[in-house]
């Protein structure tokens, strides 16, 4: 036994085994309708499970063989699939018009049947099958790279085909979610990949627009994931008139051994015949013997030589320890090119003048090719670096923003303290609702950054979004009410808490920590929670006054406007009750939910410096506003058509009848988050901000 054969043991199968797989084909008299319903089910994201391969093969048989089972059974496709271990099981149901009628009545298919019952299909066009198959083929060229690269490539191809007027795909097919579904199906379905590749190569007549797209995509898929094979065959194993010659750079003994092993791996790959260029996409046997890491020096030299010849496809990364070898091979190949060109010019030039012209041309050509190649490679590296940085920034921003939101919502939900009945400009009655600034969190913001500050504002203040920070709030001077009752003194602990929070927030604003800079792009965006805050109406509020109430679906509902409460209750004896109901434990109509209370979060509370010890209490005749630009009150119309007087309707000592009706109605019929967004008043953000600053 040759001892050196030990090195190759285990690289070739000695007892080849093929796993048997059953594929269900569907045969009806309404095959086009069934195929369209299969496409609709896939587009809807329904998981067909083990029926997926059969459904896709049914589409292919309908498109290429017009559902002629005899033609398909005698085709090379069926023979290859049988050799690969696939067994075809045909389900015949001539009268079936819906896909769910041909599914076997077995228990594990019951969820699929239930999902298909809700699916409505009105399409019955045969051309839609080819449209779907051609759309799937767009993902083949970059399938082995990853979903992002594959989707980007598919979108570029879609743009090209639309500009050429070949075919136009439905818009909802081009969404990222749908394209990820198709990518996942193509990645896992061997049958679909194989049939598309086989027909893309072998279909020579009867082409329509969809078949030409499939052939074009298959042509771009050749040697996908087999860059080392392509570069070595083109630049290292050079084909000449006298045979195959090794490149001078790989004639050393150590690299020669790698070349011999590579030739053996190539001979194994060549057994797959016409499918060998697609071995990586189809995951054929022997493909694992062609990795770059198995031939490190040969791979580095081949990529360096390919780059010297202007191949930008060779801009992949090699191992760090072989990067210098690659660059050395690149420089050596450039010098060898110049030498060969010089020798050729000496042989073909008839005089010195022609020789000089040819030498100058070839020198310029080599330099131009070299510079262009390096420019393209540097652009690719910059693009990769930008993408990596963008992904990291997005991850960091999402984590920081979600953490800050979670801190606010959790502290807001877990704090059982009832609302203090004092009217203050921005009195902070829950110290836990504002976490102190933490490094590497979104709390590091600038004073103008109203969008990021909206993630941790006082959740009881509907106008808290519209104030950029404490400084803006303190600088906005408001006229006091003409009719004042005796002011209530603010407790000392509350004052200290406010001063502490304000100082902490100012320290966070003045921080120069670099983590703060990565969130500066929030400045140019509208407020993140703008569409989630409460609207200014009094007759369409969706939550109660209790800080512990929360929606079952996890939607943070905004609080309603708060009214004057005639009976003051002791907060210690009557703590707020936490409830999972979006409107709290409303009980009956005569419950506490409809008894208004006064709160600092009332949007009509006059704003003043928080350092003053006074507080104002609203009265029904509170009508003094310092505003010369608009006439108050004004009528506001919401998108649902509700009208109300602003701010008069917010200043009543008892809620209007419309609010009582709306609360009872919406308690019985809870609204969704989308309906909440649709119930905003028809006012722009600047108008809302102007309203808030001029109350």
Curated annotation (Swiss-Prot):
Gene Ontology terms: biological process: viral budding via host ESCRT complex; viral RNA genome packaging
Coiled coil regions, renumbered to chain: 316-341, 372-400
Signal peptide: none
GO molecular function, one term: RNA binding
Segments of skewed composition (Acidic residues): 529-547
Post-translational modification: Phosphorylated.
Renumbered residue ranges of the record's region Disordered: 426-458, 472-611
Keywords: Capsid protein, Coiled coil, Helical capsid protein, Host cytoplasm, Host-virus interaction, Phosphoprotein, Ribonucleoprotein, RNA-binding, Viral budding, Viral budding via the host ESCRT complexes, Viral nucleoprotein, Viral release from host cell, Virion
Origin superkingdom: Viruses
Motif PTAP/PSAP motif, residue numbers: 603-606
Predominant subcellular localization, coarse grouping: virion
Entry GO CC: helical viral capsid; host cell cytoplasm; ribonucleoprotein complex; viral nucleocapsid
A Pfam family recorded for this sequence: Ebola_NP
Family: Belongs to the filoviruses nucleoprotein family.
Quaternary structure and partners: Homooligomer. Homomultimerizes to form the nucleocapsid. Binds to viral genomic RNA. Interacts with VP35 and VP30 to form the nucleocapsid. Also interacts with VP24 and VP40.
Cellular localization per UniProt: Virion; Host cytoplasm
The protein's name: Nucleoprotein
Record's comment describing the protein's domains: This protein can be divided into a hydrophobic N-terminal half, and a hydrophilic and highly acidic C-terminal half. The coiled coil region is critical for homooligomerization, for the interaction with VP35 and for NP function in RNA synthesis.
Gene: NP
Polar residues: compositionally biased ranges: 474-484
Protein's job: Encapsidates the genome, protecting it from nucleases. The encapsidated genomic RNA is termed the nucleocapsid and serves as template for transcription and replication. During replication, encapsidation by NP is coupled to RNA synthesis and all replicative products are resistant to nucleases.
Lineage: Viruses, Riboviria, Orthornavirae, Negarnaviricota, Haploviricotina
Biased composition (Basic and acidic residues): 502-516
């Amino acid at each position: 036994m040759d001892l050196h054969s030990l090195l190759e043991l285990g690289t070739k199968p000695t007892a080849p085994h093929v796993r048997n797989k059953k594929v269900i084909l569907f045969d009806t008299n309404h095959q086009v309708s069934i195929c369209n319903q299969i496409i609709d089910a896939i587009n809807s994201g329904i998981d067909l499970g083990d029926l997926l391969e059969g459904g896709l093969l049914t589409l292919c048989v309908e498109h290429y063989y017009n559902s002629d089972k005899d033609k398909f059974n005698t085709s090379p496709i069926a023979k290859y699939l049988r050799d690969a271990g696939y067994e075809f099981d045909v389900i015949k149901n001539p009268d079936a018009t819906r896909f769910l009628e041909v599914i076997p009545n077995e228990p594990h298919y019951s969820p699929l049947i239930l999902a298909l019952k809700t699916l409505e299909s009105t399409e019955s066009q045969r051309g839609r099958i080819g449209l779907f198959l051609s759309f799937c083929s767009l993902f083949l060229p970059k399938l082995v790279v990853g979903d992002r690269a594959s989707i980007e490539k598919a979108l570029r191809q879609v743009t090209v085909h639309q500009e050429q007027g070949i075919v136009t795909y439905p818009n909802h097919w081009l969404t990222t979610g749908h394209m990820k579904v198709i990518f996942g199906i193509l990645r896992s379905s061997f049958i679909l990949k194989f049939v598309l590749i086989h027909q893309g190569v072998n279909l020579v007549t009867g082409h329509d627009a969809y078949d030409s797209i499939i052939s074009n995509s298959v042509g771009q898929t050749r040697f996908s994931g087999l860059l080392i094979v392509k570069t070595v065959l083109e630049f290292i194993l050079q084909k000449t008139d006298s045979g195959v010659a090794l490149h001078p750079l790989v004639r050393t003994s150590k690299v020669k051994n790698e070349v011999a092993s590579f030739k053996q791996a190539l001979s194994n790959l060549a057994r797959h015949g016409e499918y060998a260029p697609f071995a990586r996409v189809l995951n054929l046997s022997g493909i694992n013997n062609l990795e770059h890491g198995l031939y490190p020096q040969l791979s580095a030299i081949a990529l360096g030589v390919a780059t010297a010849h202007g191949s930008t496809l060779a801009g992949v990364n090699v191992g760090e320890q072989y990067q210098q070898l690659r660059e050395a091979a690149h420089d050596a190949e450039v010098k060898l090119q110049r030498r060969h060109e010089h020798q050729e010019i000496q042989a073909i030039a008839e005089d010195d003048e022609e020789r000089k012209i040819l030498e100058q041309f070839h020198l310029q050509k080599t330099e131009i090719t070299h510079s262009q190649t390096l420019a393209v490679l540097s652009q690719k590296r910059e693009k990769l670096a930008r993408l990596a940085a963008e992904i990291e920034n997005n991850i960091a921003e999402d984590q920081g923003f979600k953490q800050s939101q979670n801190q606010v919502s959790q502290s807001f939900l877990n704090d059982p303290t009832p609302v203090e009945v004092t009217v203050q400009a921005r009195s902070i009655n829950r110290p836990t609702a504002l976490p102190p600034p933490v490094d590497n969190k979104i709390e590091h913001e600038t004073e103008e950054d109203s969008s990021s500050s909206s993630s941790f504002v006082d959740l009881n203040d509907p106008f808290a979004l519209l104030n950029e920070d404490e400084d803006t709030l303190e600088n906005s001077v408001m006229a006091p009410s003409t009719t004042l009752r005796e002011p209530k003194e603010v407790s000392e602990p509350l004052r200290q808490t406010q001063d502490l929070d304000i100082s902490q927030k100012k320290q966070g604003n003045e921080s120069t920590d670099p983590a703060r800079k990565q969130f500066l792009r929030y400045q140019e965006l509208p407020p993140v929670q703008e569409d989630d805050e409460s609207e200014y109406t009094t007759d369409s509020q969706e939550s109660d006054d209790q800080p512990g109430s929360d929606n079952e679906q996890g939607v943070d509902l905004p609080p309603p406007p708060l009214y004057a409460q005639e009976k003051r209750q002791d907060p210690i004896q009557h703590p707020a009750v936490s409830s999972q109901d979006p409107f709290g434990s409303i009980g009956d109509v005569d419950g506490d939910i409809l008894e208004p209370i006064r709160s600092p979060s009332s949007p009509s509370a006059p704003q003043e410096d928080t350092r003053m010890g006074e507080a104002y209490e609203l009265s029904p005749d509170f009508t003094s506003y310092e505003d010369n630009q608009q006439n108050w009150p004004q009528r506001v119309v919401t998108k649902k058509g509700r009208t109300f007087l602003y701010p008069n309707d917010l200043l009543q000592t008892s809620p209007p009848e419309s609010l009582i009706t709306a609360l009872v109605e919406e308690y019985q019929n809870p609204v969704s988050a989308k309906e909440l967004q649709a119930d905003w008043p028809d006012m722009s953000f600047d108008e809302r901000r102007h309203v808030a600053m001029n109350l």
